[in-house]
Amino acid sequence: MTALLELKQRIKNLYSQYEIYILPVLRFVLAMAYFIWINTNMGYMKQIDNIFIVLILALICSILPSGVMIFVGFALMVAHGYALGIEVAGFMLVLILFMAILFLRFSSDNNLVLVFTPLSFGFSVPTLLPIGSGLLCNAFSALPAGCGVIIYYFIRFIRVQHKLLENPDVAIADKLKLLTDGIVQNWGMWITVIAFIAVILLVNLIRTRSFDYAWRIAIIAGGVVYVLMIIAGGFYFRLDIDAVSYTHLRAHET
């Protein structure tokens, strides 16, 4: 245990000494991963689905405040949505503004959690996100985490339905109804949102207590609660828990 504490202190000292160089590099890597994820899962506008565009945007984000990365990502999403249709871009923009006004403005110090959330799904480690946020951030990180889950599921929904959404013969009203249902009736998404928020609040509550092994207990409790909530939610809504984000999406294709 003493060796771990010494290693932690050395890392802190190294970081404080070279922070001016380390932070831009970390922001660049994170922005690159986030923008590549967006282009990989959307990629409808070929002009911005380009590694050189991603590199330029990531370089810009590396020298600017971290919040810029979030809004650049939003801009990419809206642009890709516009390639499918003006109604898709408009719906995406309204959804983003809704989240920014009602939720993200209260958690500005933790909003990078929104970037990490879809990446955690992309790397197939979603359980680590709420546990890590509860350990390293405050309780308000539950807001961007929940928003990140919605962004992830909505992008995956658009990916499944993009043929229908870009079809000019489909009425705009029908497309808007489809998009609305993709949010409101996506029970797999809402199960995950609730699980993320509950785990972050629980882990943060335990972690901030003064008893021994609080961190270890918080990690174990968070993992157990997450798994139980996902399984219980999947059982209640009769979803295939191994593919909870796809079961509901496929229902819209029929």
Give short role names for the model-derived ranges.
Residues 46-48, 84-94, 189-194:
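Structural signature of hydrophobic alpha-helical transmembrane segments
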Residues 74-144:
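Membrane-interface helix-loop-helix junctions at boundaries between adjacent transmembrane segments
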Residues 20-74, 80-81, 90:
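Hydrophobic transmembrane alpha-helices
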Residues 1-16:
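Short, Lys/Arg-rich, polar N-terminal cytosolic tail immediately upstream
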